[in-house]
């Protein structure tokens, strides 16, 4: 499971997810990618489930790059506890994903295999996603 080795503070404010992703909006490592169309918190368990779905479908061929990392802790108070008396204990880790962010990349496989692998991965995530191709230098953006 993905999580930071150490953090400066155990608890964080929730924050707001405004606007589009600033960086990581293009396919850099592989030939194909899975791009977010909505903003959400993606947990480390969801990232791992998506990774397993992709690698299981691709078998031994190809390579997968995970371009998001769950660096934000989220907290929860136990059930049936009254309001107040401090913030809850850290429950897990999430990655903040905004629209336009390429979350996963795949390389070394055909387009059909990559499209199906990324489709299976998208079913494990709580947001709408789209399949994107790497932009060739000097060419137009190839998105489908």
Swiss-Prot record:
GO terms under cellular component: cytosolic large ribosomal subunit
Transit peptide as UniProt keyword: no
Superkingdom to which the source organism belongs: Bacteria
Gene Ontology molecular function terms on file: rRNA binding; structural constituent of ribosome; tRNA binding
Swiss-Prot/TrEMBL GO biological process terms: translation
Keywords annotated in UniProt: Ribonucleoprotein, Ribosomal protein, RNA-binding, rRNA-binding, tRNA-binding
Record has Transferase as a keyword: no
Pfam families: Ribosomal_L16
InterPro entries per the UniProt record, alphabetical: Ribosomal_uL16 (IPR047873), Ribosomal_uL16_bact-type (IPR000114), Ribosomal_uL16_CS (IPR020798), Ribosomal_uL16_dom (IPR016180), Ribosomal_uL16_sf (IPR036920)
Record's subunit section: Part of the 50S ribosomal subunit.
Record function comment: Binds 23S rRNA and is also seen to make contacts with the A and possibly P site tRNAs.
Protein name as it appears in the record: Large ribosomal subunit protein uL16
GN (gene name): rplP
């Amino acid at each position: 499971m993905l999580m930071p080795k150490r953090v400066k503070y155990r608890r964080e404010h929730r924050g707001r997810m405004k606007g589009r992703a600033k960086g990581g909006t293009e396919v850099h490592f592989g030939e194909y990618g899975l791009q977010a169309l909505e903003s959400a918190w993606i947990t480390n368990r969801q990232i791992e489930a998506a990774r397993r779905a992709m690698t299981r479908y691709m078998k031994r061929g190809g390579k997968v790059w995970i371009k998001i990392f769950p660096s934000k802790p989220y907290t929860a108070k136990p059930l049936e506890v009254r309001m107040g008396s401090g913030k809850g204990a850290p429950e897990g880790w999430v990655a903040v994903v905004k629209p336009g962010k390429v979350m996963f990349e795949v390389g070394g496989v055909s387009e059909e295999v990559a499209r199906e692998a990324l489709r299976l991965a998208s079913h494990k995530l709580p947001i709408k996603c789209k399949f994107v191709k790497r932009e060739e230098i000097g060419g137009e953006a190839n998105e489908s």
